[in-house]
Structure formats: C-alpha cells, structure tokens
Amino acid sequence: YDAMVAAYQNDFRNGFWHWTSFRFYAILAYMKKYNITQIVHVENDVMIFENIANITFHRPDKLLLTMDNEHRCVPGLMYIPNAHILEQCLFQFDHKQNDMQNWGNVYHIKDQPWIETLPIAPKDSPQKVSPILTNHYEHYNSIFDAASIGQYLGGIDPRNSEQKDTKGFINTHCDFKYHNYDFTWLYEGQNKVPYMKIPSSTGNLQIIKIINLHVHSKNLCQFIFPQHS
C-alpha cells in the first residue's frame, strides 16, 4: 500500500485509476480471510432503494455487474458470489487499463464462465440496444443504474466540470438514452423510490422501478426525502 501511494502521488488524483482496480484485490483478500461469500459491493456514491436482502439475484453463482455499452462496465454496484470467481476474473486484468475496461474485457472473454450482466434498461422500449444492457430484465422487472441515470438526475462530480449545475448531464458513453424519458418518485411504504416512465414498443406506458442511483455528483442528500407517515 505505501509503495503504491509513493508511486502514484504524481498521477491523476494520486493514482485514481490504479486505486479503482486495487479495491477489488482488497475485497478479494477480505473474502478469503473471513471466508465471506455472496457480497454486494457498492461505491460510496451509490444509493440503493431496495433492501439488498430482498433482491433475489438471477445467478447467485456468478459475478453480476452493469455494462452501459457493449464494452464498458461501470462497477458501481456488483454482486460477487465468492472469492474464487473474483480471483479468476482478476487474473485476467491488464493493469495498463482501468477497471471499467478490464471488467468489460473479462466479460467478453469467449465462453467465460464467471460473469453475467444486470439490466440497465427494459427489453421492451423504443430504443434498440445490445442485449447486454437488457439481459435478465424479466427476472427483476426493474433496472439498475450503471451511472447515467444518476448523472442525468443529479449531475456529475463537480471536480469534472466548471459548471455549477450539471443536472441533465447526458453520458455519451451509455448506449441507452435516458434523457428521452421522464422520471418520477413514488412511495413504497415509508420511502420514496425512483421510477422511469417509458413507452413500450406498442405505445403503452411502462413505469419501471430503478433499484439504485449512481450519484456521480456525490450530493446524495438531494435524493433523501422525508419518510411518509
């Protein structure tokens, strides 16, 4: 650790892109040491609007992640079944690339047995996108936010822009164009939960739950609402 700090002190944000990959080795060490299985890893700017214990993942034996285009993974939320699978994935990493590129590359290894994707878009919509973005939607009847919804609704990291207000930001890397649709907040029990309004291919309006938001702006408070009495 100390050697990495010294080596990267002059890099972008003190080695930001190196640390984003290093975290997975730290998670691996933790899982091995304490014999931990079936964990959900979330970045600290990700808000989850569902009790994790109530989410039945479609393949509890595989590592599940979000891809926002054919080749890029945004690992803000990831289900990791066990240390063995995580380790096999990390063996494939090219440390000249960042974590988003590496996870995307591992996913695309021919006949790889370790990874499947979580849906970031519904299967039935006006947009035609890769099945990578919609696979297993029917299992959840909900979508996960890789990054673009949180960026659109809440803006981006202020360190990345000179604009004070970046709400409405459109992530051009993401193949699904969320800015074409409306969003609303509905109470589930005492808590408000985000939903996307999107027509089906036949024109019927779908109101689709969003399980998490990747709040890139780091301003999580804007999405914390008073509990419904």
Map each language-model feature to its residues:
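Catalytic core and acceptor-binding pocket of nucleotide-sugar-dependent glycosyltransferases
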Residues: E87-S229
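Conserved nucleotide-sugar donor-binding
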Residues: C73-C89
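A structural signal for short coil/turn segments at secondary-structure junctions
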Residues: Y34-N35, R59, K110
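N-terminal cationic-hydrophobic initiation segments that often serve targeting/anchoring roles
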Residues: L28-K32, T56, Y107
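Short beta-strand-to-loop acidic/aromatic patch adjacent to the donor-nucleotide binding site
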Residues: I36-M47
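Short aromatic/basic micro-patch
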Residues: S21, Y79-I80, Q97
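Active-site-proximal specificity loops/subdomain of glycosyltransferases
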Residues: Y1-K32
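Conserved donor-nucleotide/metal-binding helix-loop-beta segment in metal-dependent transferases, i.e.
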Residues: V46-L77
